[in-house]
Amino acid sequence: MMATERANRMKLDRVSEKRALVNNAILGLYDYGGTAVFNAVTEYNTETGGNYTPVTVMAPSVFREFMIWLASKIDYLRELMQDNGKMFHQDVTGKEVDRHTPMSRQKLFLHSAFEKYFRANCSNLFNPSYLPEFAAVESVAYWQNPQAPMDVQGTAKTIDSAGAVQTVTTALCEDVIGILFDDDFMGLSNISNWSAPEPYNARFGYQNTWYHSTYRSITDWSENSLLIRLA
């Protein structure tokens, strides 16, 4: 029982570190704006001449067509990310650099509700079995808070145009569908795990054991990444 509880707590620590890394990326991309963010409803309105909102686009009369369009658009954005270009990353110190990300190096973290919407409404377009070159589609039940599963709130560490680290404060990034990125864009490594027991407490008959983990993370803003929102 205690060993299981300890393992669960250590796993939760790792999950928390990963979630914090992804949320930092979401808030950073939201702050950069421009081509770092794809606002799906806005783009849908532009292409169709509609006047939908994140609420009205989910109405039964529109929902299926919008999901089919969105699945196709994400597929198109993945193709764009394969080509050398400057659209999906940040350039620093005044030097523009072309980047490309092959399908096999792309990852998509997708809100699980939308993964299920895609499968229900357009499985012939959005089906991992038809995407053998696509490295990973990972379903995420919530980004930060299960009570507001599509929202992220807080601060983020990014880089400015000179390449220096900066802290950005974003009150709230709402309606996050997913994040598409090069697998070099962000990563997390556990560089040290160790444990040691305290001396045995002879009076009360117990012994504490302390567990330590050290994580290091990286977010390379010069690599390709894209925030996808229902906005």
Model-identified regions with their sequence ranges:
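Alpha-helical scaffold segments that mediate packing/assembly in large oligomeric complexes
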Residues: A3-Y76
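Hydrophobic transmembrane signal anchors and adjacent membrane-proximal interface regions, especially
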Residues: L12-D13, L27, A36-V41, Y52-P60, ...
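Solvent-exposed, non-transmembrane amphipathic alpha-helical segments
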Residues: V15-K18, V22-I26, Y30, D83-Q90, ...
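Generic detector of intrinsically disordered, low-complexity, polar/charged segments
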Residues: A25, Y30, T46-E47, Q82, ...
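Long, charge-rich alpha-helical interaction segments
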Residues: E43-F114, F118-C122
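Extended, compositionally biased alpha-helical segments that mediate assembly or anchoring
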Residues: Y117-A231
